[in-house]
């Protein structure tokens, strides 16, 4: 490797792969994943509306 050839031989970005044809199983799997993601987002939204689950209990003072 001479001084003129310095640097990386590979390009920084890899060429994009061709999108493969999805069969029915893949489509069903992707649809199921989307539904699970939506359910998770809805659960997060509901959880953020309410306060903390544990609010009471023994409170410790800063003194010893």
Curated annotation (Swiss-Prot):
Compositionally biased spans, kind Basic and acidic residues: 27-38
Q: Which InterPro entries match?
A: TMA7
Which keywords appear in this protein's UniProt record, sorted alphabetically? Answer: Coiled coil
Which intervals of the chain form a coiled coil?
27-50
Give any Pfam family that matches.
TMA7
Q: Where is this region: Disordered?
A: 1-64
User: Where is composition skewed (Low complexity) in this entry?
Assistant: 39-50
Q: Any stretches that span the bilayer, and where are they?
A: none
Comp. bias regions, Gly residues: 53-64
PANTHER family with a match to the protein in the record:
TRANSLATION MACHINERY-ASSOCIATED PROTEIN 7
Q: What is this protein called?
A: Translation machinery-associated protein 7 homolog
- What organism, scientifically named, is this protein from? Drosophila melanogaster
Provide the taxonomic classification: Eukaryota, Metazoa, Ecdysozoa, Arthropoda, Hexapoda
